[in-house]
Design a protein with these regions (language model features):
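Alpha-helical cap/lid subdomain in secreted, periplasmic
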Residues: 57-202
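Serine-esterase "nucleophile elbow" of acetyl-processing enzymes
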Residues: 1-48, 58-67, 182
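Short, flexible loop segments at the rims of nucleotide/cofactor-binding pockets, characterized by
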Residues: 47-51, 134-135
Length: 202
């Protein structure tokens, strides 16, 4: 039996979709279909609206985290939304990578990071009055920091930002709140993760 720890924000808890339709649960379904036993439900430390520092505080309160076979990290959209600087995010994100690594006994091959989705490419984004070109540029800057940190530590990074942009005009890919991804979009994330074959030798 393998145990998966998912760290993040609203995207990780699957805001506006059923709990079993979160991307991490759909991913676990696909891992199980390949013959790997995964403890369910996946253990999630995440909440809508959390920034990197708020996630770190929640992890501290949840200590000891214990030992895990897999750990995922998806965080940062709320840092960008609140106008926080990239340098501060970079430091806090790197500390969260330390936490994820510690949870899997410092095995980088057992950590999976996902990029920050582009919330500007949603019905909510279109109606919010923000400069969406600037929003996309800021998200790109955050994701560049994520890319550099993951590359330096040989940690796998899945680019889901490109999916949120590619399917932005498809109403099936947005949840009813107009902001978060739908179960169908999360299915694309889960399938993309399976295609990497990352955990094929569990």
């Amino acid at each position: 039996m393998h145990h998966l720890l998912a760290l993040g924000d609203s995207y990780t808890i699957g805001e506006a979709v059923a709990p079993d339709q979160r991307w991490v649960e759909q991913w676990a379904d696909l891992i199980q279909a390949e013959g790997h036993a995964i403890a369910r439900p996946v253990h999630v430390i995440a909440q809508t609206g959390w920034t990197t520092d708020e996630l770190a505080q929640a992890i501290t309160l949840a200590q000891p985290l214990g030992a895990w076979d897999l750990a995922t990290l998806l965080i940062g959209v709320n840092n960008q939304y609140r106008g926080r600087d990239v340098d501060g995010f970079d430091r806090e994100f790197n500390a969260l990578l330390d936490t994820a690594m510690a949870a899997v006994a410092d095995r980088p091959e057992r950590v999976q990071v996902l990029s920050i989705p582009d919330w500007g490419q949603t019905p909510f984004g279109a109606a919010c009055g923000r400069d969406l070109i600037q929003v996309s540029a800021e998200i790109d800057a955050y994701n560049q920091a994520i890319t550099q940190r993951c590359s330096a530590r040989s940690i796998a990074l899945l680019d889901v930002t490109v999916l949120t942009r590619r399917f932005s005009a498809d109403p099936r890919m947005h949840a009813e709140d107009g902001l978060h991804p739908s179960a169908a979009m999360y299915r694309l994330w889960a399938e993309a993760l399976i295609c990497t074959g990352k955990f094929g030798r569990l």
